[in-house]
Amino acid sequence: MDDYQQTIRSLSDRIVLAQTPIRVLDAVKWDENIRKGFLKGKGKEMPAVDRDYYASRPLSFDSGAVKLEFQNIERDVTRRLGQFNPVGQIMRRMCREYRQVVRMLEARGTADFGLISQELYGAASDAFHAGDPTLADLGLMLSDYLNNIDGRGDLKDEPKTLTAKEAVDMLQSRLNKVFGEAEETIRVFESDGIVADAAAGADYIKIRADAMFNSRDVRALEVHEGLVHVGTTLNGLNQPICTFLSKGPPSSTVTQEGLAILMEVIAFASYPTRLRKLTNRTRAIDMVEQGADFLQVFEFFREQGFEMAESYGNASRIFRGSTPTGLPFTKDLSYLKGFIMVYNYIQLAVRKGKLEQVPLLFCGKTTLEDMRTLRQLVDEGLVVPPKYLPEQFRDMNALSAWMCFSNFLNHLSLDRIEADYSNIL
């Protein structure tokens, strides 16, 4: 490793170390007492969460010291690499993002929390491009399509008969075939300390101990949490110089969640109920941005057919870190927002004949705006291509053909097609 590479590696390692104590989801989640109190009141009273509630649960790190360290790293990146160095620009942005994340966590229970969340993850009112529909529009459009599917009544959900233990065993077996059984690369285990049905770490997937699953759920988790989230983390950990690619600031969350949803679709692992879950989150965030409170969002989920406990869980995702009458935590916009952005990126890469760019989405916790730079860094030997790639991205033939058709279909008018097909459909 030459001096230039060593400089990048040392600065990169400092970013990885500095972000270690930051645990966003742990810092914003509501504890079991809040859930029990709300359900005991039959969902009629606001959860007892305010600024004082978060003050009673202080951050597990010295926020001032962490912000200062990122400030120092950002200054040292400029001092040692200059203002326009491509790797330096990525690392400086990461430092700024992490400082903003810490400020958001310091603002738990205040109006600033929701405002900073919008800066980091976006808002439901954001348009994809000038003149295009917003995320909120996308949520409503998808809901309409899903309602048409639901109205048929013949696409039934499989009953959830698999326990967490059975889901763990199935996932472990499948992922061992992908990542290597002998190496024990990925561990899958039960956990009672998570809000979602599953969550991925660096080399593990946690399954909520009291959750029930069906075979479709397990397949989606295999693709979403395993092939994408754990896969990109392992590829990031495999980077010899740009070690920062093993960690994901908010800008990479949008790209990574979008990539995971896209993988579900092209692996035929998604299904209407799964998509409904994502659209409901987007619609709920839009409701809160329009002024809805916790009880109104809770009722929205009840109207969607969820039981009281699940409706509480869904609503609390939207308000975690905030208060029951405050602005939402907008991280859950990442799924649909990221899907559209990543899909468009791959479409354009195929149109322009730049297929070599696409697999680099998996070389770590990548961010779309960095993709051209990452291609350059691979050519310079500063970034290594991904070791673990889903088969759909190892062989780009099928995906390329799909995107060629997709590029053409974008030019057709669905309204015109609907009118012309009215006599045959």
For every predicted segment, state its role.
Residues 198-204, 231-237, 309-315:
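Active-site-adjacent bridging/hinge elements
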Residues 218-231:
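Short alpha-helix carrying the canonical HExxH Zn2+-binding catalytic motif
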Residues 1-134, 403, 408-425:
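N-terminal low-structure segments adjacent to metalloprotease catalytic domains
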Residues 52, 56, 61, 216, ...:
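Post-HEXXH active-site segment of zinc metalloproteases
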Residues 173-184, 230-238, 263-273, 348-351:
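Secondary-structure boundary elements
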Residues 81-213:
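Contiguous, non-catalytic segments that form substrate-binding/exosite surfaces or channel walls
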Residues 274-425:
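Conserved alpha-helical "signature site"
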Residues 246-286, 338:
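Post-HExxH zinc-binding segment in Zn-dependent metallohydrolases
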